[in-house]
From Swiss-Prot:
It comes from Limosilactobacillus reuteri (strain DSM 20016) (Lactobacillus reuteri). ATP binds at G169, D170, R171, K172, T173, G174, K175, T176. This is ATP synthase subunit alpha. F-type ATPases have 2 components, CF(1) - the catalytic core - and CF(0) - the membrane proton channel. CF(1) has five subunits: alpha(3), beta(3), gamma(1), delta(1), epsilon(1). CF(0) has three main subunits: a(1), b(2) and c(9-12). The alpha and beta chains form an alternating ring which encloses part of the gamma chain. CF(1) is attached to CF(0) by a central stalk formed by the gamma and epsilon chains, while a peripheral stalk is formed by the delta and b chains. It comes from the Bacteria.
Amino acid sequence: MSIKTEEISSLIKKQLANYQDKVSVEETGTVTYVGDGVARADGLDNAMAGELLEFSNGVYGMAQNLESNDVGIVILGDYTGIREGDTVKRTGRIMEVPVGDALLGRVVDSLGRPIDGLGEIKTDKTRPIERKAPGVMERKSVSVPLQTGIKVIDALVPIGRGQRELIIGDRKTGKTAIALDTIINQKNQDVICIYVAIGQKESTVRASVETLRKYGALDYTIVVSASASNPAPMLYIAPYAGAAMGEEFMFNGKDVLIVYDDLSKQADAYRELSLILRRPPGREAYPGDIFYTHSRLLERAARLSDDLGGGSMTALPIIQTQAGDVSAYIPTNVISITDGQIFLDSDEFYAGQRPAIDAGTSVSRVGGDAQIKAMKKVAGTLRLDIASYNELASFAQFGSDLDAATQAKLARGQRTMEVLKQGLHDPLPVEEQVVTLFALSRGFIDKVEIEDVQRYESELAAYMHANHQDLYDTIKKTGKLPEGDDLQNAVAKFSETFQGTKKQVAEEK
């Protein structure tokens, strides 16, 4: 077959037209060790701390240890397919996760990938998981309440938007229940919620998701799950990923509530990583920067200044104690970082006082400024009343011949503790809480038998809704008690008509 001369020149011209002189340069290294969720690689001399690195099988890792002869990498995924001698290349990017409205109602892993079987998440927005916390001048003081719907918290340890309030207690004392109830109570409050489950059983996470779905809270909630079966690096980065998702809303002027459940397991995962990376162990074998690990996370919760949109991110970190020991290393660290703590006591829990919040050791350091005036007025002496009741109750065990004043105090204390009990996933609007505590503080509940207190409370709420909705509306809109004696008269009128169980039984006979 002969080719004409003019065809040869046109073929050469075509080839030259397709020629590109751009050369893609990739900096690659070689894996020298892999195991337990960690790899080491040499040849990555210019890698940055926290940079995303890609292994030859498509799994990503994050540069953690930058040493003179190699780089320590935490592997973000299944490490069983990575072998010594594999190549690993730099991406030039730091670790990012997808953010935005598309994540609402979804369950994702630590990398923002969906794990709920509802298809891919369509968003083109991403944010780095590590970000410097807002500075002093970028913040505003906490002054807007975040209602949890739980009487004992809203009355004694009020939380404000932009606050960090620690929930601490032994296992199985109701820590997660308080966090979920708070999320459920944000319905119609224009608050975006993020629930970060760290190191939990997948069945437990599933139950939490179904609870949120049942009460209609999943529509405004993102669930980030790094379950116990995930490698340690996924547990370590999960809270930072959740914080990045929350910051997207916060910097767009919205209010965010984020729950870290729990940071004890994240600390354990970070300890595991650090020991495998051969970092020097410190107290309880935790690395020296374990305090910084938690402080840089929790400092990202803030109420932003008006110049930055006035958004907020409220953090509820959870810490699990052992045998009620709040003086251990991680609990004391997180207590010192946060703006207060809600301490759950296992003895109270098993005695039937639920939520089992210890009023003596629980405190809110900045939330008092955010508490509405009506609640301040009716709950002013509540903490003191509980403290004196606990003291009298332990003293009364030794003798029965108590004077009338002491007996009256004991009776009021018993009714106070009964009022502060609350059912699971049953948060109350703040106006109902205020009226109940008003009835308690004005002595209307003193005449009610202890077994009838909770029925009195629910019937009072129903009576007020039916006959005095305007009083509820006043409390809700103004944050203050209604002027005059209207509320006093309404509660007094209901109390006259309320019939205790004993009276009902006597009448039936």
